[in-house]
Every structure is written in C-alpha cells, then in structure tokens.
Amino acid sequence: MKKISLKTLRKSFNLNKSKEETDFMVVQQPSLASDFGKDDSLFGSCYGKDMASCDINGEDEKGGKNRSKSESLMGTLKRRLSAKQKSKGKAGTPSGSSADEDTFSSSSAPIVFKDVRAQRPIRSTSLRSHHYSPTPWPLRPTNSEETCIKMEVRVKALVHSSSPSPALNGVRKDFHDLQSETACQEQANSLKSSASHNGDLHLHLDEHVPVVIGLMPQDYIQYTVPLDEGMYPLEGSRSYCLDSSSPMEVSAVPPQVGGRSFPEDESQVDQDLVVAPEIFVDQSVNGLLIGTTGVMLQSPRAGQDDVPPLSPLLPPMQNNQIQRNFSGLTGTEAHVAESMRCHLNFDPNSAPGVARVYDSVQSSGPMVVTSLTEELKKLAKQGWYWGPITRWEAEGKLANVPDGSFLVRDSSDDRYLLSLSFRSHGKTLHTRIEHSNGRFSFYEQPDVEGHTSIVDLIEHSIRDSENGAFCYSRSRLPGSATYPVRLTNPVSRFMQVRSLQYLCRFVIRQYTRIDLIQKLPLPNKMKDYLQEKHY
C-alpha cells in the first residue's frame, strides 16, 4: 500500500480548489461577448457574418476539447503560484491529473482572459481605419445603374428642348463621347434599345446625336429682350426735314445777281393782314420762303413763336413730347448710340431743337450721334450762342447794333435745331440752320455745302463776310426787297454781366440734368428757380 504524505494531499486539495474556482468564474465571460455584440451593432454592416457574430463562448467551446473549461485570471495566478511551489519543494511525485493540468495551463497561457481582452483594441482599430478610409462605403451595383439612368434621362430632357441654335453659348458634345465610361455604356445601350412605356421618358438616340451637357432646357429658350422705353421704332414715324418737292420750297423769284438770296422778315406785310396769325397753322404760311437756296426765315408774327421755347436742359412739354427712337439703326448700333448718349450725359429731350436732331441722324449711325452730342457741348461754350431765347429777345439784343451783328439761338420750329438772328439794312432778320447727316448749313442741301461743326460754319461765314456779303436774303412774296447777309460782329452773351443768382443757376444747369434737380439737397424755392424755362 502506497503511502501518501500530507504535502501531496495539500497539493491535490489546492488543485481541486482552483479547478472549482475556475468552473465558477467561467460565468463572467458571457459579459465579454455582450460587449463585443454592442460593437457589432455599430460596425457589423461593414464585415461578414463570421466576424460580426464572433463571441467568446464559441472559442471556449473549441478550447474545451483540450481542457475541461476556461479559467479565470484568479485561477491562472493560483496555478502558476502552485507550480512554483512544486518546483521549490521537489518532494513527492505529482499525480497524472495534476501534471496534465499544469502542462495545459502553461501551454494555454497566450489565450487566457487577459490576452482575449487585448483583441478588442485591435479590432476597433481596424474598424476606425476602415471608417475613415477615402472610400469607406463601396458603391453598390445599383448605384452605377441609377447614375446611368439619371444621366440618360437628363440628356433626353435636353434633347427635348426647343431647338437650340448653334449661336447659343453652351458646351456641345456628341452622345458617344458621353459613353466613354464602361460602367455606364451597357446601361445606356440598354436604355436606347428599350421601348418607352409612356412615350416621353426615353428616346431612341443615334450614336452621333449632338446634345447639350451642363445646361437645362430653359437656358436655351430664345426670347427677345425688350428695349428701353423710347427706343422702339415708331410706326409711320414722321420726318422733320422738308421734302424738296414741297411747294413752299419753290421760289418764283429769280435769284439776284452777285450772290445767293435770302428772304427777309417784312413786318409791314404782317401788319397789313386782317386775319390773326393764329389761324395760320401751316408752316408754309407762318414761315417765309428763302430763295432757290431753300433757307427759311421766321416770320416775327408767327403764332408758334409766341410760345417761348424750352431750355436746352429742360424736357419738352408733355403734349408736344416726341418719343425718341433709333429706328434707322440696327439693334447693336442703336444700343451703342443710346449708351454713348447716356455716357456723355446729354439728354436729347432737353430742348425742341436738340431732340429733333436725333430723329434726323438716326439713319447715320452712332458715330453721327456721338459727334453731334460733342458739337452741341462745344456750341454751349461760344459767346454768340444764346441758347433758348425767343425771337423777340433776340431782336432786343440786336436793337442798337450795326449791320453785320448776329447771334445764334435755339429754334422754336420743331423741324430745326438752331436759328440765326442777324442785322441787315437796319433790320433784324431770322433764318434757320439746316442739319442733315451730321452737317450744318444755311442752305437746303447741307450734304453738299455744309460743315460738320456749327462753330466751323459760323467761322467760315465770318471769313467770307470780310470781303462783302456772302449771300442775300429775300421774302417769299414776289417783288420783295433783297438784303445782303454779312456776319461780321458776333454779339456775345459774355459781355453782359448777370446776377450772381443767375450765374449760379447757369453753372448748376450745366452739370445737372433737369430730372435730377429735385434730388439736390436744396430748398424747394431754389429748386423751382433752377427749373425755370429760361436762364
């Protein structure tokens, strides 16, 4: 009978106790599996089922083939401590069961509970790296199909648009260039060959059908942009230039020898008239005819001259306002002319004469409009230009001056821009300045004998008057006297000193449009004074 020492019993007792404790501690391990289950609920969609459903119990069952059950940390420490005590004691031979358990404990040390917990940061790190990768979620096969379908429908919608012309700004591309990607090629071909259910969603597109990429169909709808108010062509727009076939331009009196002839104002003829001048509505009655040269003089008793003209910076009366138009120009040229007019800060509606000039130059192009605007600005700096004064005021300025004195003023006739008032044989006469195609003249055909500048016309007439009369004037009535015309003494408005109030208004009106005066930070009385007709 074999003897069993006390030390051997103690060792057997300790091993059995640790084995019982190990069996008891196994109950805590399912909590680890539940912890991993929480992570799987968050990231499990990115991995397979085998990785998402991993748990500790499955590993314990696999390890149970080599050992009875897993052991806890406390049981492992106790076994290692007992193993050290065995090596120190070296007394007695351990039992076979205890040796097998020690061998199992040392060999299974890398996969004990402490090492199992180390797998969690490794797995979470892989999840984090996957979550923040450049392509975290792989595209499903349906995504590429949907992309191709959406692009196909978009292209078909663009083809449905209302016939975009080649002049439209847009990127054009053949449909076969759109199919360069292999992912969408098969889907596009299938959509081409497939029949449409509703008849509008799909089109059978050929390979070389041009389509518009990047713009919606409404971007290619052609529409006409309306022009600004006042620039529409007028239907039956009237001309303000006298027709050469008009009977009032035909003279029955032969021209005088020694030069051209001018008609003059005969105040006595008007005084002999019994009928009031307001009856003569026709301009051919109120105006006296020039000779064969076609220069028009104004009658001093004309009914329309009783109404004072407006200032160059004042708009015309509402009942006589003429709508500005550039019907003779193309769309681009009319826009250039209007832009140039606004850029020069000059309003063609400001005065009767200035407004009418724009109608006469509408067929001459924007350069004529620009040159005319600059010429009118240059004219305002001349001393002999008196602006919007009436014929009665002009006669008052020329009352006590010698023959050859003259001044230029705004014409009160709707068909003309400027008028010339001059002295001849002790009388004050008036004639209008013709304008056509950017040229100014005293005669009917300014294209032949005219000047591009009003200042040049007056200066040229002054030089011609040094050697005598450069032309003659006469009345339209047969047998009327003829008067020589000389321009030698310009009457300057700068020679008369006006009040400070008048000069201030003159400067303000030079740099401020009439429609902007109400916006000036001035009292209402001063605004009314600035808006008076004459200055």
Swiss-Prot record:
It comes from the Eukaryota. GO terms for molecular function: 1-phosphatidylinositol-3-kinase regulator activity. Residues 80-105 are annotated as: Disordered. Residues 486-535 form the SOCS box domain. Pathway: Protein modification; protein ubiquitination. Residues 80-89 have a biased composition (Basic residues). Pfam families: SH2, SOCS_box. CDD domains: SH2_SOCS6, SOCS_SOCS6. Gene3D superfamilies: SH2 domain, SOCS box. GO terms for biological process: intracellular signal transduction; negative regulation of signal transduction; negative regulation of T cell activation; phosphatidylinositol phosphate biosynthetic process; proteasomal protein catabolic process; protein ubiquitination; regulation of growth. Keywords: Growth regulation, SH2 domain, Signal transduction inhibitor, Ubl conjugation pathway. Residues 384-491 form the SH2 domain. The keyword Nucleus does not apply. One of its GO terms (cellular component) is immunological synapse. The keyword Metal-binding does not apply. Interacts with RBCK1. Interacts with phosphorylated IRS4. Interacts with KIT (phosphorylated). Interacts with PIM3. SOCS family proteins form part of a classical negative feedback system that regulates cytokine signal transduction. May be a substrate recognition component of a SCF-like ECS (Elongin BC-CUL2/5-SOCS-box protein) E3 ubiquitin-protein ligase complex which mediates the ubiquitination and subsequent proteasomal degradation of target proteins. Regulates KIT degradation by ubiquitination of the tyrosine-phosphorylated receptor. The SOCS box domain mediates the interaction with the Elongin BC complex, an adapter module in different E3 ubiquitin ligase complexes. This is Suppressor of cytokine signaling 6. It comes from Pongo abelii. The lineage of its organism: Eukaryota, Metazoa, Chordata, Craniata, Vertebrata.
